[in-house]
Amino acid sequence: MNLGPTEILLILVIVVLLFGAKKLPDAARSLGRSMRIFKSEVKEMSNDDQRYEEQQQQRQIAAQAQQQVVNPVEIPQPQPTDIQRPQQ
């Protein structure tokens, strides 16, 4: 979409007619605030995504670590032995 100088001038004239010369600075200020809020929300959403991915990775690491835990060594219990009784 290529806008030439005449198209840009026409758009500016329409904007001035719609908002009026007095309200134009307020409208620009409001637009700037809205853009700033939008950018901060987008940045926060990407940070939330990164935190979620980090949590998922930590959960996977924890699950792998739990699978690798070795059962404690079991000490064999002494088995009863056959004792021969003396014959009488």
Curated annotation (Swiss-Prot):
Keyword Transport: yes
Stretch list, region Disordered: 46-88
Signal sequence bounds: none
Ranges of Basic and acidic residues composition bias in the record: 46-56
Domain of life: Bacteria
Entry keyword set: Cell membrane, Membrane, Protein transport, Translocation, Transmembrane, Transmembrane helix, Transport
Locations listed in the record: Cell membrane
InterPro entries hit by this protein: TatA/B/E (IPR003369), TatA/E (IPR006312)
GO cellular component terms, A-Z: TAT protein transport complex
Gene Ontology molecular-function annotations: protein transmembrane transporter activity
Family: Belongs to the TatA/E family.
Record protein name field: Sec-independent protein translocase protein TatA
Organism: Corynebacterium diphtheriae (strain ATCC 700971 / NCTC 13129 / Biotype gravis)
